Amino acid sequence: MNKSMLIFFTILFLTYIIEEKEALKVEDLPEPESYKRAKQLAVKDAKGDKNAETIALNFLKQNRRDCMKNCKLVPTCALLSPECCPDKTDVCKKLAL
């Protein structure tokens, strides 16, 4: 591989890293009250079982992230991600989805 190709791919890779680092992610947003209530219910339903609690919280987190892209994924998308469902707000449009 010649030097120009190496330089090109290095710059491309660095641009990708910077873009990913600076992009607004779902985890960067404050949690809405409806999502906090859903997390509390998940912990309550686990009845002290830490494994079940972890699975439920991970499930909610993944659904919140996926609902940002597709509001018809589950019926509770409007509760999990009110920034994007049913209407996309400016915050939702800035997310790196």
Curated annotation (Swiss-Prot):
Record's signal peptide: 1-23
Record has Signal as a keyword: yes
Keyword vocabulary terms for this entry: Disulfide bond, Secreted, Signal, Toxin
Domain of life of the native organism: Eukaryota
Tissue expression as described in the entry: Expressed by the venom gland.
One annotated GO molecular function: toxin activity
Coiled coil: none
PTM remark: Contains 3 disulfide bonds.
Compartments where found: Secreted
Gene Ontology cellular component list: extracellular region
Family: Belongs to the scoloptoxin-10 family.
Name of the molecule in the record: U-scoloptoxin(10)-Ssd2a
Source species: Scolopendra dehaani
